[in-house]
Amino acid sequence: MTDIHNHKILILDFGSQYTQLIARRVREVDVFCEIFPHDVAADFIKNYQAKGIILSGGPESVYDSDVKAPEIVFELGVPVLGICYGMQTMVMQHGGEVKGADQSEFGKAIINILNSTNNIFSNMEHEQLVWMSHSDKVTQTGEHFEIIASSTNAPVAAVAHKNKPFFGVQFHPETTHTENGKQIIENFVVNICGCDTLWNIENIIENDIKEIKQKVGTDKVILGLSGGVDSSVVAAILHQAIGDQLTCIFVDTGLLRLNEDDQVMQVFAEHMDINVIRINAKNRFLDALRGICDPEQKRKIIGKLFVDIFDEEAAKIENAKWLAQGTIYSDVIESAGNNQSKAHVIKSHHNVGGLPKEMKLKLLEPLRELFKDEVRKLGLGLGLPYNMLYRHPFPGPGLGVRILGEIKKEYVETLQKADAIFTEELYKHNLYHDVSQAFGVFLPVKSVGVVGDQRRYEYVIALRAVVSIDFMTATWANLPYDFLSLVSNRIVNEVKQVSRVVYDVTGKPPGTIEWE
């Protein structure tokens, strides 16, 4: 079996908003990498045995901060790439000088490559469009570095060490705005560091299956299956690895999208022949939510009841030793970021509410090394349907936070029908994948309408569609008026409990993506 971790890159994080992008770009050229805090222990860096090290950008100013790259980085003899702040601290630690720029530079810029021989700019045109985001700049490179690229506002746009494989760029090759950023990353990782391209879906599947078999042996494994991307891919990889040793528990809350409960059973229980226990808990959730209007209270009730029901059912499965979860790499990084110590051991991220103490199950997280886009590709490689893997994000509490105020069975059914029409038309008009998220919201207010000669006094549905890269900010989707008119007409005509449809034109900020 191929050792997919044999050739790897270590990324030291100085707090840049783009650090995860660096990792994703490295993995896009089929090389494994991991992110750790910049102040991780020197022994850890030494023992990690990276083929190369990348120093990320960061929000600090080098000249008034004691945040520096560990000296061990420059003593190991492996190639180093400093990005933005990473370049500045590397140059400064080698006798160069960094000062505050007269003018901050944010946005696209043209750099001129002065030297592309055997470095990060190999086989690239002399003019390159890049993305700048900095307030400081290198003013003196010192005796060890030479300038290999410059721009109008950043005379030192990139540097190379005269004797060692150390490189720095003032811009951000990891962003899509840098036209040939992927080529720069590939030049560093593959050509300079000499990494073999082992990190691909076929190798990951082979590696994961072997690791799961070795770890689990003949034990039984329990998985909470929600129908979401992560738990679905975990179910598929575990089934390939251990077959009938896996039992999935699907808690049907009644708050899923239209027919989603049946679709989950169809894909996993019927087509893939996975052992799935379906728990019809619709009435329990409705009873628990009766009279509750506060959004936060609703979330807590739904989350606690879900875990309680899962625990009840899991306790009935004899000889189960493992609890599988869909923890992914961004969860792991987030957990590490919340840990203020320098420890490089990353704490577990329990995305199903944590391990119940009395169950004493060991945790199995087959996806913890993968980003979301890698999880989706893994799912395709395992034979899961494209539309299941590339659906829009869906909140954990489900429609519970898309029905404003109290949740009633009538409201759920009304929203399911309206939301399904919106989604169906987005697919029909090839708009679904042009937006990042789209859904309906049930408003518990009534509005007068006229259908035929009949006066109707029924509920209002709000349609929400946004475009976003990271979901931290979002713009409302500028869907065609004809399309919105069609969707509105269908909902009012086909869903008898709705008399009016409105479209949400609020960005984030000031609004949030979900209404509750």
Curated annotation (Swiss-Prot):
InterPro entries: Class_I_gatase-like, GATASE, GMP_synth_C, GMP_synth_GATase, GMP_synthase, GMPS_ATP_PPase_dom, NAD/GMP_synthase, Rossmann-like_a/b/a_fold. The keyword Ligase applies. Residues 8-198 form the Glutamine amidotransferase type-1 domain. ATP binds at S226, G227, G228, V229, D230, S231, S232. Pathway: Purine metabolism; GMP biosynthesis; GMP from XMP (L-Gln route): step 1/1. Pfam families: GATase, GMP_synt_C, NAD_synthase. It comes from the Bacteria. Its EC number is 6.3.5.2. Coiled coil: none annotated. The active site is at C84 (nucleophile), H172, E174. Keywords: ATP-binding, Glutamine amidotransferase, GMP biosynthesis, Ligase, Nucleotide-binding, Purine biosynthesis. Residues 199-391 form the GMPS ATP-PPase domain. It catalyses: XMP + L-glutamine + ATP + H2O = GMP + L-glutamate + AMP + diphosphate + 2 H(+). GO terms for cellular component: cytosol. GO terms for molecular function: ATP binding; GMP synthase activity. PANTHER family: GMP SYNTHASE [GLUTAMINE-HYDROLYZING], GMP SYNTHASE-RELATED. HAMAP family: GMP_synthase. Homodimer. Catalyzes the synthesis of GMP from XMP. This is GMP synthase [glutamine-hydrolyzing]. The lineage of its organism: Bacteria, Pseudomonadati, Pseudomonadota, Gammaproteobacteria, Thiotrichales.
